């Protein structure tokens, strides 16, 4: 067995000393104050984490339109998972234009966090013994002679070997220590990363592994991504669960506004105005509230919010956030689709 010594400095992160309970519950403080309308989904994700902690791997997809709150939900879930000291977490993200240019981009980003984070030495040792084709992707962590040794080991390595090695490495790492692996914006994923995820989801061995993917279904269709077929096949075989985020209702918007107003009473009709104009999209909702504040339509008075003009005189127009998102979607269309629009 070879020992691998770090070249780069690894900063340790202190971990809680409390032990994890057998059952996972979601306390109210798991989510930020402005986290609304997603409590039931968060509870289901927590239940999936409970299964992963018991050794049953979980493959989950959180889907929804742009601005619907996928990343906010993931943040809240990771905050919940961080309360368990044995749970290791890593997060990678696909980047528009990188799918097909840099193979395994989101996985390498997540692994990069693991080889530099808490218990990094263990991760490097496992990669050295189980997945040298992946360890070589982080040359800054190795001495020159170690890099040369790895290069000899992986000479002639195939894509199939890389898939097998990372699956085996993650299973070794999660045999006793749970891992939450989050990969975002998977509508831009590269085919090689999908091969790894497909293999991880289908393998039957025990693993304390929870994989959580986020993506926009419309983008998957527009880009003709193979992710759609993979997800459907895994769902059919009960190897994947999908959580599609719906738009917020008026009660959710009201709860958000009250949280922003520190619990103060809201002007009559304000929640309906914001809900109607945002159509329940959390990103647009937040943008509308900012515009109301910046334009002076809402002011803080005696600790609460007060309208400076009647609701029917407030002209919200099209928020910059919405306009930019629409422009991006139009830019992605081909000429025929633009003509139809």
Regions found by a protein language model. Give the residues of each.
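DNA-binding patch around the recognition helix
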Residues: 1-12
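Key residue(s) within conserved catalytic/signature motifs
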Residues: 4, 22-341
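C-terminal end segment of the histidine kinase catalytic
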Residues: 13-17
């Amino acid at each position: 067995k070879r020992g691998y010594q770090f070249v780069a400095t690894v900063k340790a992160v202190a971990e809680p000393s409390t032990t994890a309970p057998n059952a996972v519950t979601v306390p109210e403080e798991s989510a930020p104050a402005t986290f609304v309308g997603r409590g039931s989904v968060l509870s289901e994700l927590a239940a999936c984490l409970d299964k992963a902690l018991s050794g049953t791997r979980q493959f989950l997809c959180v889907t929804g339109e742009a601005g619907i709150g996928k990343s906010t939900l993931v943040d809240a879930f990771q905050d919940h998972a961080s309360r368990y000291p044995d749970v290791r977490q890593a997060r990678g993200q696909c980047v528009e234009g990188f799918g097909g240019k840099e193979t395994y981009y989101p996985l390498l980003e997540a692994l990069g966090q693991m080889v530099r984070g808490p218990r990094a030495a263990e991760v490097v040792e496992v990669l050295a013994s189980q997945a040298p084709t992946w360890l070589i992707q982080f040359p800054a962590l190795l001495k020159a002679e170690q890099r040369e040794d790895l290069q000899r080991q992986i000479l002639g390595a195939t894509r199939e070997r890389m898939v097998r090695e990372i699956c085996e490495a993650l299973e070794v790492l999660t045999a006793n220590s749970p891992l939450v692996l989050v990969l975002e914006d998977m509508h831009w994923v590269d085919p090689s990363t999908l091969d790894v995820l497909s293999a991880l989801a289908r393998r039957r061995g025990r693993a304390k592994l929870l994989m959580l993917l986020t993506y926009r279904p419309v983008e998957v269709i527009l880009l003709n991504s193979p992710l759609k077929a993979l997800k459907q096949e895994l769902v059919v075989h009960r190897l994947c669960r999908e959580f599609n985020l719906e738009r917020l209702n008026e009660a959710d918007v009201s709860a958000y506004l009250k949280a922003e107003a520190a619990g103060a009473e809201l002007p009559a009709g304000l929640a309906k105005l914001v809900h109607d104009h945002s159509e329940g999209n959390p990103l647009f909702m937040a943008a509308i509230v900012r515009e109301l504040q910046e334009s002076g339509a809402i002011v803080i008075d005696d600790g609460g919010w007060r309208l400076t003009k009647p609701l029917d005189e407030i002209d919200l127009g099209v928020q910059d956030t919405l306009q930019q998102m629409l422009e991006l979607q139009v830019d992605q269309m081909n000429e025929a689709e633009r003509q139809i629009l």
